[in-house]
Swiss-Prot record:
Signal peptide as annotated in the record: none
Pfam families recorded: GapR_DNA-bd
Protein name as it appears in the record: UPF0335 protein RL4065
Family membership: Belongs to the UPF0335 family.
Highest taxon in the source lineage: Bacteria
Database matches in InterPro entries: GapR-like, GapR-like_DNA-bd
NCBIfam families listed in its UniProt record: PRK13694.1
Organism of origin: Rhizobium johnstonii (strain DSM 114642 / LMG 32736 / 3841)
One of the record's GO molecular function terms: DNA binding
Length: 87
């Protein structure tokens, strides 16, 4: 029975160590992304808009169109636009 516990302990340790390595890689990547946004900002780009563009590019066209239609409906209801844009 003690061998089974030892194996489980070793497996658990291996999982934890893998997760820790991946978390460190994730932090490094997040720092790299932050640096890229900083470079873009330094060249005059609006990073808030860049982040929106990145988020939009992750979505498929149909999903984007549905979200835009809902947004237009809400803006129209709030009087923030006169009529939904054609398109």
């Amino acid at each position: 029975m003690s061998d089974a516990h030892g194996v489980a302990r070793d497996q658990l340790r291996a999982f934890i160590e893998r997760i820790e390595r991946l978390e460190e890689e994730k932090k490094t990547i997040a720092d790299d992304i932050k640096d890229v946004y900083g470079e873009a900002k330094g060249m005059g780009f609006d990073t808030k808009i860049l982040k929106k563009v990145v988020a939009l590019r992750k979505k498929d066209e149909q999903e984007r169109m549905e979200e835009e239609a809902i947004l237009d409906t809400y803006l129209l209801a709030l009087g923030m636009i006169e009529s939904p844009p054609e398109g």
